[in-house]
Curated annotation (Swiss-Prot):
Protein's name in the database: Alpha-crystallin A chain
Chief location category: cytoplasm
Annotated binding of Zn(2+) 2, by residue: 107
Gene3D superfamilies: 2.60.40.790
GO cellular component: cytoplasm; nucleus
Originating species: Tapirus indicus
GO molecular function, one term: unfolded protein binding
Gene, per the UniProt record: CRYAA
Taxonomic classification: Eukaryota, Metazoa, Chordata, Craniata, Vertebrata
Length: 173
């Protein structure tokens, strides 16, 4: 029995016009016209699909920044309202959970749910954490860092999500 072995460079996503795995972060996002064209979707393998014209902000991928003065998480949650989001800090982790019940859209009914967990640096001041949702659906979780040697205040608590009326100033990478 012959088994085809693919080189690792073949499996990497080298750009928006190269194939990506079926079960990547875009799974369940809906279909585009090019997803239905058989010559594009099965050119390489039936388990690969083209992810054309997708941007980082449309993908739900988060961005974590940690510099000398602060720690910031940017997360695209454009399909959720502040009431659908729960943000809480437990020990050294921040947990962001989003869920909305089934609702109707242009193509039928849809429900969404996600759960993200991030480790907080040990020097983040947990008493001064904040979380806001911009008008364009970008969730920003941030907290200042304290100088080393001071207590960062570790405990479990919920962080309220405030709504901003202006779009996010997060970079699009």
């Amino acid at each position: 029995m012959d088994i085809a072995i693919q080189h690792p460079w073949f499996k990497r996503t080298l750009g928006p016009f190269y194939p990506s795995r079926l079960f990547d972060q875009f799974f369940g996002e809906g279909l585009f016209e090019y997803d239905l064209l058989p010559f594009l979707s099965s050119t390489i393998s039936p388990y690969y699909r083209q992810s054309l014209f997708r941007t980082v902000l449309d993908s739900g991928i988060s961005e974590v920044r940690s510099d000398r003065d602060k720690f910031v998480i940017f997360l695209d949650v454009k399909h959720f309202s502040p009431e659908d989001l729960t943000v809480k800090v437990q020990e050294d982790f921040v947990e962001i959970h989003g869920k909305h019940n089934e609702r109707q859209d242009d193509h039928g009914y849809i429900s969404r749910e996600f759960h993200r967990r991030y480790r907080l640096p040990s020097n983040v001041d947990q008493t001064a954490l904040s979380c806001s949702l911009s008008a364009d659906g970008m969730l920003t979780f941030s907290g200042p860092k304290v100088p080393s040697g001071l207590d960062a205040g570790h405990s479990e608590r919920a962080i309220p999500v405030s709504r901003e009326e202006k779009p996010s100033s997060a970079p699009s990478s």
